[in-house]
Amino acid sequence: MGKSILLINGPNLNLLGTREPQIYGSTTLADVEASCKAHAESLGATLATFQSNHEGAIIDRIQAARGNVDGIVINPGAFTHTSVAIRDALLGVGIPFIELHVSNVHAREPWRHHSYFSDKAAGIIVGLGVYGYKVAVEHVALNFKERAIL
């Protein structure tokens, strides 16, 4: 049985491809998700995707993943800098996760430099554009342990 990966995108990432393309590029979220699903399958893994602009919905999806996925790739968007609640949900389910950002948040406004997730993430991918999603999915598929099937 291959690994099961959950890809979560936070607020405004539904606007990928149209929102500030000079920062985020012109690839849409639908294109990113399709590419990541195909890449996961080529590695023998499965990928589920989820996007929400609402903190509570993201928390609910993380909690629903408990016992069902081997790893999470999360681009928390602006919640990176504000959400202790999403951090607590990730820690509460005990699923290893990769934190991902399309842009180099450390080269942007100073308030974007702090993350509530980085110190607990298994890895952080920053500034590689949408290619970072493929890197994250590949890392989870090849390096994370499969959950125990009881």
UniProtKB/Swiss-Prot annotation:
It is an enzyme of class 4 (lyase). GO terms for molecular function: 3-dehydroquinate dehydratase activity. The record marks 19 as: Transition state stabilizer. GO terms for biological process: 3,4-dihydroxybenzoate biosynthetic process; quinate catabolic process. The active site is at 24 (proton acceptor), 101 (proton donor). It comes from the Eukaryota. The keyword Lyase applies. Is involved in the catabolism of quinate. Allows the utilization of quinate as carbon source via the beta-ketoadipate pathway. Homododecamer. Adopts a ring-like structure, composed of an arrangement of two hexameric rings stacked on top of one another. This is Catabolic 3-dehydroquinase 1. It comes from Neosartorya fischeri (strain ATCC 1020 / DSM 3700 / CBS 544.65 / FGSC A1164 / JCM 1740 / NRRL 181 / WB 181).
